[in-house]
Amino acid sequence: MRIALGVIAATCATPLAIAAVFGALYSLQVGWFGEQGWPLVKESIALYAAFSAPVAFFLTIAAGGPLSHRLAHLGHTGFRRHAMAGIILGATPFILFDGYVIGTNLLLDVRPAPDINTVKMALRWAALGAWCGLWSAGAYWVVVIRGR
């Protein structure tokens, strides 16, 4: 039962992480968020939350949960290692996709070639994925691993 609750908590933590980041960026008027009104930012939060929840569910079932239990079995019940695993697993889909797109463009000699802005955007997406992975790992750790 705790594992099922942990999967639910990890899945729900990702949309909350996105809402926290987008809300903070809107409050601080950073970049695109500073130029848009709150209704559009709210729609963006809903869209990204709807997309990220199934991805978080799949990653928790396929990799995050088993990895957390393996770490706990090896005696690593502290939050730090579980957080690092969440950060890595959260960033992995973005790194793989961006690496595929940039690599394919380079191999096919597509014009225009990826510039520094493309790489910066890829790093931003990977950072958002890592942030969401940290929240999911924390939620799973609190519900399932802590206090074992």
Set out the residue ranges of the language-model regions:
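Juxtamembrane/disordered regions of integral membrane proteins
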Residues: 1-148
